[in-house]
């Protein structure tokens, strides 16, 4: 091979080497005031990363971790559960009792007919029940008797806060009212005051209603309780062991009934 061919091959080799090297140069380069964009085939082939995928993956991981920081890990120990509320407990509590039977929990059911956050907040009754039964988990279902209270955020906020103060550090879930009509703000108030992952918003759920048009039929209330439990597993701040029992109900370990407030 003569010298002219050797020269051409040498130039071609140098050009290919230069092209390959520059393809790994991610930010381009400048010569004499001119900017040149380098080739991207190395990144396209996955031979070099521009960092975008890694940054995206890291960001998604960080977001997932930060979104779960407020959630406690699943607690699989047996619980002593206190369930307080209004007449909605007639449908909810028997289904929760079935969950408790299956999972080794005890359940104290306390129905105060026609009660509200006002009644409970003024009475100090929750503190009395906590001192008597020593629950380590609390369910609350209140708000159904407060759908039409005017200026409710001003009128009832102190009593919601009083109840939360009585609950203290005990893990809890507050089941919101099963709206049959638009409310004046009880759900907004509860959303504002309750801790993240502790309020189950029921207003948009679908229910089969009993003849009074307000209370869900018993079968519909059982499904309501099932939805609450499922939500606790995925979105609740304090998930506990609540494996689903067969369809059906049971009876709470203790049942306490208070007549409507005067």
Please report, for each region that a protein language model flagged, where it lies by residue:
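Conserved SGNH/GDSL esterase-like catalytic core that processes O-acyl groups on lipids
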Residues: 70-156
